[in-house]
């Protein structure tokens, strides 16, 4: 099925937001919705691109288990959309679509050394949607869509997410919801790159680990180093707050240590999520548009609130295991297990050097790990998609940067990095 070929679907954003400069204010996450009819749900598909990240709902149900979609690309050269089959989500008759957007890599609003803060493509989040079957055009994104702000009051890829449950939009995913107070979406400029379907393995939540409180500093331990985020179950009064800070190590006194990890972030929080309670019984929350590298979480409570459980949610590309190794040496078996977990922790759509400090896809690091990775996992589609970004980031002179995707930083790493294109 061919999508977006006639250019009638429009990139849309929130009315009243204008990105003037790199110092433009960080805005709450936009929430979009649209009621639409569908005569026959069979064979209906959606193509969606929400930059930087999106979460999609049809008739109140989240579509797919994917997270952190779409995977980052060189947005001024190539933009990925994702296709989902909606046959099992749609009704014959009235339906409603809901989409939440996060900043992701598209709007890296915190100053850092890799120049994404100054990326040529950087702008406020935007959305492109097309729903159709082989025989029927059903829905396109345009100014008839409704948009507002909601409980995600802040999100930053390397910072974290802030969620105020008192601002939740109860019932917004129902066709009958009254959205008359919402504004109409506005047409926004395209991000610059041409549209192409995402083919890499998606990121998903691949496991859940109960974290245990280990000391008087309210530090919780996952028992292993992971990539992902925390999910909390809390109860308390409206306005009480929980602040979650993430780290891989502890100081000798048992407090979190982010030494050497946060020094390249020049403003704002680092690996910190914040939740404000609505005061309505038991509340369960986890962030949508960020991820962290950690083993330990410091959970600080302000106000009348009690944390009943804190769980670590493992996030990585959902790569199928295709190889294994075992032997009579427990040390080597343990090393193999650590290697596999470390590899997955550093594959969130792109092969990264670390899941906390940078999250960047260093070409030299990736070319050293690719053989080990392909022995263990079916990563061919994901590497192929990433290699497309090499072409997009390459200068007319032939120069390649050390990290890809790239916002114009570090085009002089040398052969050990450049050779990743060939090996």
Predicted regions, residues:
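Well-ordered alpha-helical segments within folded domains of soluble proteins
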Residues: 363-374, 383-384, 415-423
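Extracellular/oxidizing-compartment recognition motifs
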Residues: 1-356, 364-365, 379-390, 396-409
């Amino acid at each position: 099925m061919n999508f977006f070929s006639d250019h009638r679907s429009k990139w849309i954003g929130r009315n009243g937001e204008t990105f003037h400069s790199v110092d433009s204010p960080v805005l709450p996450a936009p929430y979009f919705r649209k009621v639409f009819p569908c005569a026959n749900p069979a064979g209906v598909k959606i193509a969606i691109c929400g930059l930087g990240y999106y979460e999609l709902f049809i008739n109140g149900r989240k579509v797919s288990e994917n997270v952190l979609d779409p995977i980052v690309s060189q947005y001024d050269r190539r933009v990925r959309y994702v296709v989902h089959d909606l046959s099992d989500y749609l009704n014959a008759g009235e339906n409603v679509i809901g989409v939440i957007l996060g900043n992701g890599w598209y709007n890296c609003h915190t100053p850092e050394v890799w120049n994404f803060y100054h990326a040529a493509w950087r702008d406020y989040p935007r959305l492109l949607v097309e729903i159709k079957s082989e025989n029927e055009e059903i829905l396109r994104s345009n100014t008839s869509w409704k948009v507002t702000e909601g409980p995600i009051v802040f999100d930053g890829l390397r910072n974290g997410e802030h969620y105020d449950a008192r601002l939740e939009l109860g019932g917004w995913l129902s066709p009958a919801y009254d959205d008359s107070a919402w504004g109409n979406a506005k047409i926004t400029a395209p991000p610059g790159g041409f549209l192409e379907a995402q083919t890499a393995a998606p990121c998903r939540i691949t496991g859940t680990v109960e974290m245990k409180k280990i000391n008087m500093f309210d530090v919780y331990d996952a028992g292993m180093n992971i990539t992902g985020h925390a999910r909390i179950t809390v109860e308390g009064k409206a306005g009480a707050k929980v602040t979650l800070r993430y780290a891989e190590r502890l100081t000798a006194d048992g407090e979190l240590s982010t030494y050497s990890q946060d020094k390249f972030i020049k403003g704002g929080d680092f690996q910190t999520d914040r939740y404000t309670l609505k005061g309505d019984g038991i509340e369960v929350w986890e962030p949508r548009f960020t991820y962290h590298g950690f083993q330990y979480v410091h959970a600080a409570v302000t106000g009348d609130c009690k944390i009943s459980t804190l769980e670590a949610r493992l996030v990585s590309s959902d790569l199928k295991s295709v190889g294994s190794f075992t032997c009579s040496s427990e040390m080597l078996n343990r090393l193999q297990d650590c290697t596999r977990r470390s590899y997955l922790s550093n594959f969130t759509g792109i092969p990264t050097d670390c899941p906390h400090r940078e999250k960047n896809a260093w070409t030299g690091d990736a070319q050293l790990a690719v053989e080990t990775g392909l022995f263990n996992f079916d990563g061919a589609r994901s590497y192929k998609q990433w290699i497309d970004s090499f072409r997009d980031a390459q200068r007319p002179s032939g120069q390649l940067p050390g990290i890809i995707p790239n916002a114009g930083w570090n085009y002089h790493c040398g052969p050990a990095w450049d050779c990743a294109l060939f090996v």
